[in-house]
A protein has these predicted regions:
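Extracytoplasmic/periplasmic substrate-recognition and gating elements
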Residues: 94, 199, 332, 351-357, ...
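Glycine-centered hinge/linker elements that transmit conformational signals in sensory
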Residues: 255-337
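Extracytoplasmic "Venus flytrap"/periplasmic binding protein-like
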Residues: 85-163, 194-200, 206, 353-354, ...
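Ligand-binding pocket segment of bilobal, Venus flytrap-like solute-binding proteins
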Residues: 216, 220-223, 309-380, 425-444
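C-terminal capping/gating helix-and-loop segments adjacent to ligand/active sites or protein-protein/ligand interfaces
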Residues: 181, 468-541
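Short, well-ordered beta-strand elements
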Residues: 62-74, 93-98, 178, 226
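Short, low-complexity disordered leader/linker segments with a strong preference
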Residues: 1-66, 88, 539-560
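Hinge/lid segment of periplasmic solute-binding proteins
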Residues: 128-186, 259-291, 387-389
Length: 560
C-alpha cells in the first residue's frame, strides 16, 4: 500500500538495492537472541485452533500486550482500521499507530536503538542494513511453519512464495527473513494524454530514442517533459535513482555469469543452479528463484574490475552514461533542488507531461486532483485523462537486451527483535493482516482513504480483490525485474553499494556530469575512483575483509 505524497515518494521502499533482499546471510546457525526489554507480551503463542470468526476466540483472549506501529509516509486511517480489526479479535491487545514522515525516517529508526530496545514494534526496515546485520529485527522464517489461527493452515500456505521471491528449498540455518514483502510494485511511466495530443504525439514511445524525440516536442511546447525530483534523496533512493539503475541493466546483463554461484561455492544449490542456463531472451533469467548469487564473487569482480564491473574505459558504461544524460536534460528547472512533492505537483497541475510511478496511480490520481494540499489550488484542479506505458528500451551496439524495470514484492514490514512472547504477538498480528479476513479490512480501508492506493496485486493466496482492482492490475504487462540483484547497475551506478560516503560523492559527480561540467570520460573516471576509494571501508562495514575475496567459494568467517 502506498501513501501518495506522490507515488513520487514510493520507493523509500526501494531505497537501497543491496538491502532489498529480505534474506540476510550469516554464519551463525542460532536464532537471533531475544532482547530482554521487549514491551508487554502475551503469555503464550496463539493456538492452532483459534477461531477465524468475528468474535474473539479463547486463544485470542489469552493474547495480551501492545503492538506499536510506526511506518514511513503510511496512511494512518488504513493502519488504524487494521488495528481496530485486530483488536476486535484480540481484546487483550492494544495496537497503536504513530506513522512518521518519509523524510528522516531512516534516521529516526536508527536513533530508536541508541538507548537499547525501542518501544516501536512494526517498522519499514529496508534502509537500515547495519541494523539488519546486527540482527535487530525479528526473523520471520521460524513462524512460517506455525499455524495461522486466522486461516487454520500453516502460515507459509498463505503466501505466493514465488511471487515474493522466496525459495524455501534454498533457505539454510544461516538465512534470516527480516522483512516481509507481500505486496507488489511495477515501476511504469504515467503520462498526460492531453499534453501528448496537443503536441501531436499519437502513441506512447516504445524505444528510448522515440521518447527523447517526444520529450523534445513537449519541451518546445512549453511543458516539462518529466516531473522528476533531483535532490540527493531522489538521486540515491528515489525516482531518479530508479532510472539510473534501470537503464544500466540494459548494458550489463552478462554480470550474472560472474556473480552466480559456482558448483564449488558455499552458496550453490544444485536443485536451483544445476539446471540454470544464461538466456538474454528471458527477462527473468537472473531471478533469485532461478539462480543463486555469491556476493563474494560480485565483490571480487568489483575489486578486480572484471567484465561489466569495470567502469572506466568500458564502452558499455560510456554508451549508457551518454543516454542517461540525454534523459536528464528534460527534467524540471532547478532539478537538483526539486523535491518529490514539488515534482508531483507539476504533473498534477498539468505542467509536466510524464512521471515515474506505479499502478497505484490508477486510483490515487483522481483523489489527488481534488486535494488542495497537493495541487496548491483551492478545490483542487480539473482532472485530465492519463495513461501508462512501460520502460522504453535504449538501443545501440552496446545494448545487450531490452529494458526491464523494477518489478518486485514490496512492503519491507519488519518487527524489532524483542523477547519471544512479544515476537510471537507481532507475528500473530501479521498472520491476521495476511489472512483473507485481515486483508479485506486493509483493502476496504484503502478504498475509503484519501491518501492510499494499492500498488499491485498481493502475493497472498485466497485473497479476493474488488473487481476494478483485479481488472486494472491485469493491464500491466511484466517486462522483467532489475531490483535486488548483485548487478553493476545496482552496486556501482550510484556509487558503491549504497555505502553513504560513496553515494554522497557520486551525487556531486553526476550533478556536474548532467550540468555539462564533466565529459562522459571524466565522469566515469570519477565514478571508478570513487568505487576504488571506498571499497575497503565498505567491506569492513559489512564485516568482510579483502582476504575473503581470495576464496569466494568459502563462507566468510563471522566477525563482530
Amino acid at each position: 500500500m502506498l501513501n501518495r505524497k506522490g507515488s513520487a515518494v514510493l520507493l523509500s521502499m526501494l531505497m537501497a538495492s543491496s538491502v532489498l533482499a529480505a534474506c540476510s546471510k550469516s554464519n551463525d546457525t542460532s536464532e537471533p537472541s531475544p532482547s530482554s526489554s521487549g514491551s508487554g507480551a502475551p503469555t503464550s503463542e496463539p493456538s492452532a485452533s483459534a477461531s477465524a470468526s468475528a468474535s474473539p476466540s479463547e486463544s485470542a483472549q489469552a493474547l495480551k500486550g501492545t503492538i506499536n506501529i510506526s511506518l514511513p509516509n503510511a496512511s494512518s486511517s488504513v493502519w488504524n482500521a487494521v488495528a481496530q480489526g485486530y483488536m476486535a479479535k484480540n481484546p487483550g491487545v492494544k495496537v497503536t499507530v504513530d506513522n512518521k514522515p518519509l523524510e528522516g525516517y531512516k534516521e529516526w529508526l536508527t536513533a530508536q536503538f541508541a538507548a537499547g530496545t525501542p518501544d516501536v514494534d512494526m517498522v519499514v526496515n529496508n534502509e537500515v542494513a547495519g541494523l539488519m546485520n546486527d540482527r535487530k529485527f525479528m526473523d520471520y522464517y521460524p513462524y512460517f511453519d506455525k499455524q495461522n489461527p486466522y486461516t487454520n493452515k500453516p502460515w507459509k500456505d498463505s503466501f505466493d512464495l514465488s511471487a515474493m521471491g522466496i525459495n524455501l528449498d534454498g533457505v539454510g540455518p544461516e538465512d534470516y527473513l527480516y522483512n516481509l514483502n507481500f505486496e507488489s510494485v511495477q515501476i511504469v511511466w504515467v503520462y498526460n494524454k492531453e499534453i501528448f495530443q496537443k503536441v501531436g504525439i499519437a502513441q506512447t514511445p516504445k524505444t528510448f530514442d522515440e521518447m527523447m524525440n517526444d520529450f523534445k516536442k513537449i519541451k518546445e511546447a512549453g511543458y516539462t517533459p518529466l516531473a522528476l525530483a533531483g535532490n540527493s534523496n531522489s538521486m540515491w533512493s528515489g525516482q531518479a535513482g530508479w532510472l539510473v539503475r534501470i537503464y544500466a541493466d540494459q548494458y550489463l546483463r552478462d554480470y550474472i555469469n560472474i556473480a552466480r554461484s559456482q558448483e564449488q561455492d558455499y552458496t550453490y544449490l544444485p536443485e536451483v543452479d544445476g539446471t540454470w542456463k544464461y538466456d538474454l531472451n528471458d527477462p527473468f533469467n537472473d531471478a533469485n528463484s532461478k539462480v543463486t548469487k555469491n556476493e563474494l564473487r560480485q565483490l571480487k569482480a568489483i575489486k578486480d574490475k572484471a567484465g561489466p564491473y569495470k567502469i572506466e574505459g568500458n564502452p558499455k558504461w560510456a554508451a549508457y552514461a551518454d543516454n542517461l544524460k540525454r534523459l536528464f536534460q528534460y527534467v524540471p528547472s532547478g532539478f537538483f533542488g526539486v523535491k518529490d512533492d514539488q515534482a508531483y505537483n507539476l504533473f498534477l497541475t498539468g505542467k509536466a507531461a510524464t512521471m515515474m510511478s506505479t499502478p497505484a496511480s490508477y486510483w490515487q490520481l483522481p483523489k489527488d486532483f481534488a486535494d488542495e494540499s497537493k495541487t496548491g489550488a483551492k478545490g483542487g484542479v480539473k482532472p485530465f485523462e492519463y495513461g501508462f506505458y512501460n520502460m522504453p528500451s535504449m538501443e545501440g551496439p552496446e545494448v545487450m537486451a531490452p529494458a526491464r524495470t523494477i518489478q518486485i514484492p514490496i512492503g519491507f514490514y519488519g518487527f524489532v527483535n524483542k523477547n519471544a512472547e512479544q515476537n510471537a504477538l507481532n507475528a500473530d498480528f501479521m498472520m491476521y493482516l495476511t489472512s483473507p479476513e485481515g486483508y479485506a479490512v486493509y483493502v476496504k480501508a484503502i478504498q475509503a482513504s484519501s491518501d492510499a492506493s494499492l500498488s499491485g496485486a498481493p502475493a497472498l493466496k485466497d485473497i479476493t480483490l474488488p473487481p476494478e482492482m483485479t481488472k486494472a492490475f491485469a493491464d500491466f504487462s511484466p517486462i522483467g525485474n532489475t531490483e535486488g540483484y548483485q548487478s553493476p547497475g545496482n552496486s556501482l551506478a550510484r556509487g558503491l553499494m549504497d555505502y553513504q560516503p560513496s553515494v554522497q560523492d557520486w551525487v556531486g559527480s553526476v550533478q556536474r556530469f548532467f550540468d555539462g561540467k564533466l565529459t562522459t570520460e571524466q565522469y566515469l573516471k570519477e565514478l571508478q575512483a570513487n568505487v576504488d576509494k571506498y571499497f575497503v571501508p565498505m567491506l569492513k562495514q559489512g564485516k568482510k575483509e579483502l582476504s575473503d575475496l581470495d576464496t569466494p567459494e568459502r563462507r566468510p568467517p563471522e566477525r563482530k
